[in-house]
Amino acid sequence: DDAELGQHGDGYTKQLAYYELDLGLNHVSRRWATSTLRSACCLAAIPGGADGPSGVLVGGEDYIEYLHEGMSPPSSSSSSSGTKNSKRLICAIPRRELHPKSKGVLITTISVLRQKKGKFFALAQSELGDVYKVTLQMSKEDKTVVTHMTICLLDTLPIGN
């Protein structure tokens, strides 16, 4: 659905731009940009290099999306483009049974926590106070390629800022 993936009738597309800081040159450069979900409202950086695959978690209404430099834009076909992360990962947020279907669940906060070198997970909180654990599963052959994303409900806490 083009409307859900950032395409509005007025030609507006919500974009995510990824910038990189080069400490040696004291210079910031734009690495890549892509369109994202229309309801996207919060971001969390994923560790890169030896610590993980790098990229960004984007929280929005009813979904959390993982974006990386090598991923294809949402409007392109689902065929592989030859990049190592050509498939976009979008995972639906678990919903309460009594929550109205007409109202979405908005993710308001995402925080990435590191356990050990190469091991991490993210905690996300909804506007209702539900806390979710977000886990990215990497390929066994190449630890810089994310193959799956899972979200599970942990608890309900007072809303954090």
Over which residues does each language-model region extend?
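Large eukaryotic, non-enzymatic subunits of multiprotein complexes that serve as scaffolds/tethers
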Residues: 1-161
